[in-house]
């Protein structure tokens, strides 16, 4: 009898949770059945991960952890609904900076008069067990008419399933790709989006909306040191150009060990494709920390030395400046990573040079 009572209690709990996490007035569509953008490798076996681990190997545990995250992935769809909801199932919710929308939330933009305008966001602040399948609104009380929507997925969490919901009387369908050309942007936690308040406030996101190019993000936390496994995968990427934030992680030793092999591996399969390296930004944690200042000075000097050689040695390789600071140098979120405004400044600082280089290759 006691076992029966326990079973019935558990059953009632499941039914209660199911009722809490569903809405009979909504119709849901799996996001992977819509238009998925922003991925260097679009056809990964798991749609909300950024690497095809079956196709490419040689990964370290830290690589896999970061590449399973959904940073930079966008869902494009159209709807005439006045309300839009999300219903995710997470494999993992990022445990650091738990109240940050970029790490654990969804960020929605809607095109208005030809411009992408922020529309709404929502976050999932509790553990996976409590948040999986929980329906939350992105935006409500919108005017009638079809909206072209762009939804950014969390930067540091891992997603197993994502459903987008609208009231049953309305439609939701695949959107047309609003971007032209595919540009791979691979880099450190700066490109991954650490420090951004929302997933749409990263450098790749800013650049995509500002230029109309599809900047496909492969930001990998503190793990971007031009390692061979990344080069071997990137050389197979179906993209029109590469932009690299390659000198923010690592040290002078990793720059020296990996730079030339990284370029040569990619160019072996992608001759004639532009490869644009961005100089790293000046991190504000150098201001009074002499050890950090010395480490960064040596790394930057080595990058400058070797890039001077690379520009002479290889065709289609470029080096451009980047900046994420205002005049007061007060745009950092934590001493290392920029704030939203800092990332916007960074995107603006590289936008013109990137566009100018791409025009040489008919990419415009």
Tell what function each PLM region has.
Residues 95-99, 193-201, 297-301:
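Glycine- and acidic-residue-enriched helix-capping/strand-helix junction motifs
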Residues 1-22:
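Bacterial Sec-dependent N-terminal signal peptides
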Residues 283-321, 364:
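Substrate-gating cap/lid alpha-helix
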Residues 180-204:
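Catalytic nucleophile-elbow at a beta strand-turn-alpha helix junction centered on a G-D-S/GDSL motif
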Residues 204-217, 309:
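Short helix-loop-beta junction
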Residues 16-182, 351, 356-364:
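N-terminal secretory targeting modules
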Residues 270-275:
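A short helix->loop->beta-strand "cap" motif at the edges of active sites that frequently abuts
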Residues 207, 224-260, 265, 280-287:
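Oxyanion-hole/transition-state-stabilizing segment in secreted/luminal serine hydrolases
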């Amino acid at each position: 009898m006691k076992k029966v009572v326990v079973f019935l209690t558990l059953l009632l709990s499941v039914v209660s949770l199911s009722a809490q996490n569903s809405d009979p007035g909504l119709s849901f569509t799996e996001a992977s059945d819509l238009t998925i953008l922003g991925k260097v490798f679009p056809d990964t076996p798991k749609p909300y991960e950024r690497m095809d681990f079956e196709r490419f190997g040689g990964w370290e545990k830290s690589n896999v952890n970061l590449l399973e995250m959904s940073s930079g992935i966008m869902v494009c769809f159209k709807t005439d609904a006045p309300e839009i909801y999300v219903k995710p199932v997470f494999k993992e919710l990022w445990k650091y900076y738990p109240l940050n929308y970029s790490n654990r939330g969804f960020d929605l933009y809607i095109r208005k008069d030809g411009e992408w305008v922020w529309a709404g966001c929502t976050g999932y602040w509790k553990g996976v067990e409590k948040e999986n399948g929980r329906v939350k609104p992105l935006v409500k009380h919108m005017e009638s008419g079809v909206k072209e929507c762009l939804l950014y997925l969390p930067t540091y969490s891992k997603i197993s399933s994502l459903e987008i919901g609208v009231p049953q009387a309305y439609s939701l369908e695949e959107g047309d790709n609003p971007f032209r050309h595919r540009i791979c942007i691979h880099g450190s936690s700066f490109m991954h989006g650490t420090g951004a308040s929302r997933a749409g406030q990263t450098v790749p996101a800013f650049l995509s909306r500002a230029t109309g190019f599809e900047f496909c993000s492969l930001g990998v936390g503190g793990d971007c040191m031009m390692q061979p496994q990344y080069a071997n995968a990137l050389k197979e990427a179906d993209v029109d150009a590469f932009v690299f934030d390659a000198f923010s992680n690592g040290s002078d030793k990793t720059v020296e060990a990996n730079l030339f092999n990284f370029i040569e591996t990619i160019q072996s399969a992608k001759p004639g494709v532009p490869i644009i390296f961005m100089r790293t930004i000046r991190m504000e944690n150098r201001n009074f920390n002499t050890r950090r200042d010395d480490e960064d000075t040596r790394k930057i000097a080595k990058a400058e030395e070797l890039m001077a050689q690379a520009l002479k040695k290889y065709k289609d390789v470029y080096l451009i400046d980047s900046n994420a600071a205002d005049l007061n140098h007060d745009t950092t979120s934590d001493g290392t990573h920029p704030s939203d405004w800092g990332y916007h400044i960074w995107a603006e600082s590289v936008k013109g040079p990137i566009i100018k280089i791409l025009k040489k290759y008919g990419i415009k």
